[in-house]
Amino acid sequence: MPSFDVVSELDWHEVTNAVDQANREITTRYDFKGVKAHYEIKDKKSVVMEAEAEPQLRQMSDILNQKLVGRGIDLKSLEKEDVVKGNMRASQAVKMKEGLETDEAKKIVKMIKDSKAKVQAQIQGDQLRVTGKKRDDLQQVMALLRGADLAQPVQFTNFRD
């Protein structure tokens, strides 16, 4: 039976490239002259922005978003945390969401069932397996999910015929 997996993954190589580009940009920008500010990737789970003041963090956030979008990373996979101030510095972590959360997976399963497509969807950890008798049914579900407004970006992998 044909099947495919619905996953939410990040291309960490592209995230690293975007962070490097953003670091390069803040070293050359006029409004960041003489300011100690930088981005850093922590444990392939988040990007930490550090600057001297909170308004600079907002500018850094805009720069990072621009670079991530330019690299094809969906901003829905970002989750900004609160700004931490102290010791004449301000920092903010931006979590990168990977893997379908259970609530989101349940929402997708319900959406697939409501579409009356002749497929079965089952949650397998942090991904979703969709199986059906016909390839056309699976492609119909893919189109449905692409057009849906989901909280996380989704990709389709492991398409088997």
Curated annotation (Swiss-Prot):
> Is Iron-sulfur a UniProt keyword of this protein?
no
Instruction: State if Nucleotide-binding is listed as a keyword.
Output: yes
* InterPro entries (alphabetical): DUF520, UPF0234-like_C, UPF0234_N, YajQ-like_sf
Show the GO cellular component annotation of the record. cytosol
* Gene3D superfamilies given in the database record: 3.30.70.860, YajQ-like, domain 2
Q: What GO molecular functions are on record for this protein?
A: nucleotide binding
Alphabetically ordered keywords of this record: Nucleotide-binding
CDD domains (UniProt xref):
YajQ_like
> What is its biological role?
Nucleotide-binding protein.
Give the family per the record: Belongs to the YajQ family.
> What's the protein here called?
Nucleotide-binding protein Mmwyl1_2033
Instruction: Specify the species.
Output: Marinomonas sp. (strain MWYL1)
